[in-house]
Amino acid sequence: MKQGLELKLGQHLAMTPQLQQAIRLLQLSTVDLQQEVQGMLESNPLLDEETGDEGGGGPIPETVELPSEERQLDLAAENILPDELPVDSQWDDIFDMGTSGSGNGSDEDLPDFESRNSRTQSLQDYLRWQADMTHFTADERNMAELIIDAIDERGYLADSLEDLAATMNVQEDALLAVLLRVQDFDPPGVGARNLSECLLLQLKQMVEKDDAHVLLAQRIVKDHLQALGRHDYPRLCTVLGVDEAALRAAMALISALNPKPGEDVGTESTEYVIPDVIVRWAGSRLRTDLNPEAMPKLRINRHYADMAGGKDAAHKYIQDQLNEARWFIKSLQSRQDTILKVARAIVERQKDFFANGPESMRPMVLRHIADAVEMHESTVSRVTNQKYMITPRGLYEFKYFFSSHVGTDSGGSASATAIRALLIKMTQAEDAQHPLSDAEIARVLADQGIQIARRTVAKYREAANVPPASQRRRL
């Protein structure tokens, strides 16, 4: 085998730490970016945050040498958009927050109201606070504590009274007596052992508890909850001996109740979203700008930058920190430019949505925007994830505007988002006693030139949180 040397000329892209940092910054949310910026400010003395009243943030001296590896970013690594989160819905809680029982003891035994209201607390914390305000004997207080610990996040008693009584070696009747008092706590319905009891507790706490409609609602919840779930209204009227008007009034009361009262007491802190982009109407045109509140304002510390010219270890450290700071600022600016460019392309393609609503949403995939801004699809994917725009129609994540398409008779296409909007509009306008089935909705859409299978209608209906026809039927 003959050995030899061969010289080849070629180019390749090295994934430098700076390039990795730029890619990572691009896919961070605004909240995460603020944490990243704060960490960089704490670790790099060459970076300062502009506060708005400082005038020393000008360019650093010309004699300072910049890093030689500055080059155009290529953000072409593959990244797949996360699936949309499923839509979840709950009944609205119509009750005001209150307290039950009467206090006993000295002022120093009372709970700290200010600290209780100034922090997020769990359901158990809230119930213990009410127990502290209730007159219990020492044994009753221990039983109340056991019951509260056994209440799950929905507000239901997760363990049987028999098991709880065996745990404390107390009589089940004594434990039941304490449970009934805990069930008077807020939120209404807490401590229930099943759905029927939960709803009954809420009905019994209504001001008009002796009203005929409330009493009828109690009968339904206690003895006929399954029939109500099946929407068997004729049978309910017959069994209860009431007319449709009375049944309708009782059902309105029941539908206003909360089947999961424990979830009204916050167990998690509120997650805030800072919009990256602001979209507004300027006459008949849409204007898209970066949100100044979301843009980090950084500058180079001039005092330390002037010390970067030496060659000893201390000066080399300062020069390395200066190079890192310059690259970080450059990456932030590149991130902002990319977000704005993608946002403007989205708004331009979906301008009919902003003018007319979701029914006018156009089909759009990553390729459409990537071609418009002359970037790789993976770059657009990173930009659309966890980035938000505040618009005249509300707050939207960038990826909301991307959806698949369905063919039309005219040879065009309709956005899946627009079809969901049409579906919601049809179900809202339907006859309540004869709601549209999925097959009927498919036929109505076909009459409008949109060819869609019944199974696809069912998928879009579920995504829009619209129940099936059997559950939408009302009196």
Swiss-Prot record:
Keyword Transcription regulation appears in the UniProt entry: yes
GO biological process, one term: nitrogen fixation
Disulfide linkage: none
Domain of life: Bacteria
Chain location of the short sequence motif RPON box per the record: 453-461
Record feature DNA-binding region, as residue ranges: 365-384
GO cellular component labels: DNA-directed RNA polymerase complex
Pfam families: Sigma54_AID, Sigma54_CBD, Sigma54_DBD
Keyword Transcription: yes
Gene Ontology molecular-function annotations: DNA binding; DNA-binding transcription activator activity; nucleotidyltransferase activity; sigma factor activity
Alphabetized UniProt keyword annotations: DNA-binding, DNA-directed RNA polymerase, Nitrogen fixation, Nucleotidyltransferase, Sigma factor, Transcription, Transcription regulation, Transferase
Location of region: Disordered: 42-64, 95-115
NCBIfam families linked: PRK05932.1-2 (NF004595), PRK12469.1 (NF009118), rpoN_sigma (TIGR02395)
UniProt cross-references to PANTHER family, sorted A to Z: RNA POLYMERASE SIGMA-54 FACTOR (PTHR32248:SF4)
Family statement: Belongs to the sigma-54 factor family.
Function: Sigma factors are initiation factors that promote the attachment of RNA polymerase to specific initiation sites and are then released. This sigma factor is responsible for the expression of the nitrogen fixation genes. The open complex (sigma-54 and core RNA polymerase) serves as the receptor for receipt of the melting signal from the remotely bound activator protein NifA for the expression of the nitrogen fixation proteins.
Protein name as catalogued: RNA polymerase sigma-54 factor
Species, as recorded: Acidithiobacillus ferridurans
Lineage, broadest ranks: Bacteria, Pseudomonadati, Pseudomonadota, Acidithiobacillia, Acidithiobacillales
Gene, per the UniProt record: rpoN
